[in-house]
């Protein structure tokens, strides 16, 4: 049996403040660090051991991965970081409060920006500090590939080449891999693995720091997928994610 575990980072400071984060490099909150450690504990108690790990260029994912590997005593395994696993770029929405944005534009429009498949928010300008082209960490990435806004479709377009060429083929010679990334980059991978339609993907909300396990047979055919944890608690946390784009009553 082969396994890949997908893990969204722990709560970030902007998750706590209910702000659109995207490619903004926001740190974990105190709660987020605790969530990451608990995810590592849950994986250890369930007997998981990883041979390699993958994450984004953003510290909230990197630090979550470090917490998990520390709990597993696997700090030494190979780790690859890539911009392709970054969160969806939210364009001009980055930094705005989601509830306040829902008051201004309506909950339906915010839901479309957050969860639709092919609608992107307005892009940031070329000289805007939110443009990844202004960030030295992306100096090696062609400017034409760096987004100034993205839909989920756009996000999948940059995630999938890395998934298909790097991560998934690694299962041919490794048995267990860990991917720590972001809500939308992981939603794209899950959409691909489970064959979720462009319409139904809007209903998928990933809670922070809950391991999502995918098991494959020796032919790399998906045979089982499940969250690791208490189903009722996970359901409530996913519902809380869905409500982030609602106006405060």
Swiss-Prot record:
Catalytic-site annotation from UniProt: 9, 87
Reaction(s) catalysed by this chain's protein: (2R)-2-phosphoglycerate = (2R)-3-phosphoglycerate
EC number(s) stated in the UniProt entry for this protein: 5.4.2.11
Gene3D superfamilies, per database record: Phosphoglycerate mutase-like
Pathway participation: Carbohydrate degradation; glycolysis; pyruvate from D-glyceraldehyde 3-phosphate: step 3/5
Keywords carried by this UniProt record: Gluconeogenesis, Glycolysis, Isomerase
Site (Transition state stabilizer): 182
Pfam families given in the database record: His_Phos_1
Alphabetical list of SUPFAM superfamilies matching this protein: Phosphoglycerate mutase-like
BP GO terms, sorted: gluconeogenesis; glycolytic process
Domain of life per record: Bacteria
Function of the protein: Catalyzes the interconversion of 2-phosphoglycerate and 3-phosphoglycerate.
HAMAP family linked: PGAM_GpmA
Protein name (database record): 2,3-bisphosphoglycerate-dependent phosphoglycerate mutase 1
Organism: Bacteroides thetaiotaomicron (strain ATCC 29148 / DSM 2079 / JCM 5827 / CCUG 10774 / NCTC 10582 / VPI-5482 / E50)
């Amino acid at each position: 049996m082969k396994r890949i575990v997908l893990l969204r980072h722990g709560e970030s400071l902007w998750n706590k403040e209910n702000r659109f984060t995207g490619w903004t490099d926001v740190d974990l909150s105190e709660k987020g660090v605790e969530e990451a450690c608990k995810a590592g504990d849950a994986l250890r108690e369930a007997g998981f051991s990883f041979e390699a790990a993958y994450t984004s260029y953003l510290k909230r994912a990197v630090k979550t991965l470090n917490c998990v590997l520390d709990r597993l005593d696997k700090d030494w395994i190979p780790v690859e970081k890539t911009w392709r696993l970054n969160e969806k770029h939210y364009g001009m929405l980055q930094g705005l409060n989601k509830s306040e944005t829902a008051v201004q534009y309506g909950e339906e429009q915010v839901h479309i920006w957050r969860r639709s498949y092919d609608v992107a928010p307005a892009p940031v300008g070329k000289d805007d500090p939110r443009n990844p082209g202004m960030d030295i960490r992306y100096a090696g990435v062609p400017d034409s590939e760096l987004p100034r806004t993205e839909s989920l479709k756009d996000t999948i377009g940059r995630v999938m080449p890395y998934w298909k060429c790097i991560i998934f083929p690694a299962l041919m010679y490794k048995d267990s891999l860990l991917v720590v990334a972001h809500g939308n980059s992981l939603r794209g991978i899950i959409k691909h693995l489970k064959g979720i339609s462009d319409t139904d993907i809007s209903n998928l909300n990933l809670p922070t720091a809950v391991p999502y396990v995918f098991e494959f047979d020796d032919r790399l055919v998906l045979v089982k997928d499940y969250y690791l944890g208490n189903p009722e608690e996970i359901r409530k946390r996913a519902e809380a994610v869905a409500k982030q784009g609602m106006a405060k009553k």
